[in-house]
Each structure stands twice: as structure tokens, then as C-alpha cells.
Amino acid sequence: PSSNNKQEKEKLNAIQKANEFAIEIPLEVISHCLRIIELSEELIDNGNPNLVSDAGVSAEVSLAGVRGAAMNVLINLIGIDDDSYCNKKRELVNKFINDAEKNWKIVFDKTMKKIIL
């Protein structure tokens, strides 16, 4: 609890910093998930043919990881008052989601083509 304006400002500042920190981990998760989707495509193209479905599943799970981590970022942005910061993070998250979905689709199509034929 805060008993005066100074304490209230300090409390709000601490909450802002905590929310900013809480955003960094899911952004890192997104980065790793994007890389896994890329590696999944490499496995499908160059890996053991028996791993094709495993590579496809890894892309599926990684897409879910991107989306889930993105939701964590977005919920934490609600507690941040810096509009410029929030807009940059929203744009970054949208880019990551779009990239993940685009790359996932490539992996999905390649996976299905190899396991159906």
C-alpha cells in the first residue's frame, strides 16, 4: 500500500518495470520457436525421411509456442503506460506471428506432401 504521492509513483514505476521485464522472456521464447520452425523445414528437406512427421509436429508445437508467448507479451503490455514502447512491442509480436504462420505453412505443406505420397 502507498501512503503518499511519492510512494504511489514509486509503486507504479515498479509495476511498469516488472511488466517490461515480464515481456522479455516470452519474446525470447518466440525467437526460439521461430528457429525451431526453420530447423523443422531443414529436417524435412535434408534429414532422415523417417523424421518427416516429427519435424512437422515440431513446427506445429512451435507455432503454438509463438502464439502463446505472444499472448503473454500482449497481456503484459496492458500494464505499461508508455504508448511508444507498447506500439513497438505489438508491431514486433505481429511480425513474429506472421513470420511463424508463413514458415509453419511451408513446413506443413512439405510434411503433408512427403507423407501422403
Please state what every model-predicted region is.
Residues 36, 51-111, 117:
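Preference for long, well-ordered alpha-helical segments
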Residues 28-38:
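Long, amphipathic alpha-helical coiled-coil segments characteristic
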Residues 1-27:
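Long, amphipathic alpha-helical stalk/connector segments used for oligomerization, subunit docking
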Residues 25, 29, 51-54:
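Secondary-structure capping and boundary motifs in well-ordered enzyme cores
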Residues 43-51:
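Hydrophobic alpha-helical bundle architecture
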Residues 42, 113:
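Conserved helix-loop functional segments at active or binding sites
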Residues 1, 38-41:
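Membrane-helix exit/interface motif
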